[in-house]
């Protein structure tokens, strides 16, 4: 009487082992996908999150450049655009050696007074570019010019996203 049941019990045990192996493979794939998503998220954060604010009084760009010093950054205005470039040579970090470079370009609103632009870098690596908006009827000047980056000793007061 045990003969007919023995093979079916072995097949059920083999199927249960195969199902457990498939579940373990799916869990390993989900863990690998979560690690890849965290790595991608870290890369996005390190790429320089920016925020642009504009109202009737001022135009403001906030850019996370924590991996760069003021000497690594150039900010210039060309016609109606602000161009921000950051580059540092290869240096050692926790994982080996890395060099970074980025280019950002933003259109200035037509009412921004380009003769009164400022740019500063906070102690926590937040670059703040600011331009006052001119009142209607006044003419905003438009030409190419470099905007120096000054260093602030205090952290940025901008809310982090």
Curated annotation (Swiss-Prot):
Glycan-modified residues: 150
Key word Plastid present: no
Disulfide bonds: 119-130
Phosphoserine PTM sites in chain numbering: 110
Modification Deamidated glutamine, positions: 38, 135
Gene3D superfamilies reported for this sequence: 2.60.40.790
Subcellular location: Cytoplasm; Nucleus
GO biological process: lens development in camera-type eye; negative regulation of apoptotic process; protein refolding; response to heat
Keyword Acetylation attributed: yes
Cross-referenced InterPro entries: A-crystallin/Hsp20_dom, Alpha-crystallin/sHSP_animal, HSP20-like_chaperone
Region annotated Required for complex formation with BFSP1 and BFSP2, chain positions: 1-51
Residues annotated as binding Zn(2+) 1: 88, 90
Positions bearing Deamidated asparagine: 89, 111
Positions carrying N6-acetyllysine: 87
Family statement: Belongs to the small heat shock protein (HSP20) family.
Function of the protein: Contributes to the transparency and refractive index of the lens. In its oxidized form (absence of intramolecular disulfide bond), acts as a chaperone, preventing aggregation of various proteins under a wide range of stress conditions. Required for the correct formation of lens intermediate filaments as part of a complex composed of BFSP1, BFSP2 and CRYAA.
Subunit structure: Heteromer composed of three CRYAA and one CRYAB subunits. Inter-subunit bridging via zinc ions enhances stability, which is crucial as there is no protein turn over in the lens. Can also form homodimers and homotetramers (dimers of dimers) which serve as the building blocks of homooligomers. Within homooligomers, the zinc-binding motif is created from residues of 3 different molecules. His-88 and Glu-90 from one molecule are ligands of the zinc ion, and His-95 and His-142 residues from additional molecules complete the site with tetrahedral coordination geometry.
Protein name, UniProt field: Alpha-crystallin A chain
Record organism: Galegeeska rufescens
């Amino acid at each position: 009487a045990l003969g007919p049941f023995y093979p079916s019990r072995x097949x059920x045990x083999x199927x249960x082992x195969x199902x457990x192996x498939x579940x373990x493979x799916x869990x390993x794939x989900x863990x690998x996908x979560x690690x890849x998503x965290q790595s991608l998220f870290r890369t996005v954060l390190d790429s320089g999150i920016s925020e642009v604010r504009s109202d009737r009084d001022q135009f403001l760009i906030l850019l996370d450049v924590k991996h760069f010093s003021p000497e690594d950054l150039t900010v210039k205005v060309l016609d109606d655009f602000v161009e921000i470039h950051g580059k540092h040579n290869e240096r050692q970090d926790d994982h080996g050696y890395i060099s970074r470079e980025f280019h950002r370009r933003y259109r200035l609103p037509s009412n921004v007074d380009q003769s009164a632009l400022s740019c500063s870098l906070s102690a926590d690596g937040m670059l703040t570019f600011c331009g006052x908006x001119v009142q209607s009827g006044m003419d905003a000047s438009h030409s190419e010019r470099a905007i120096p980056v000054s260093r602030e000793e205090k952290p940025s007061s901008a809310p982090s996203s």
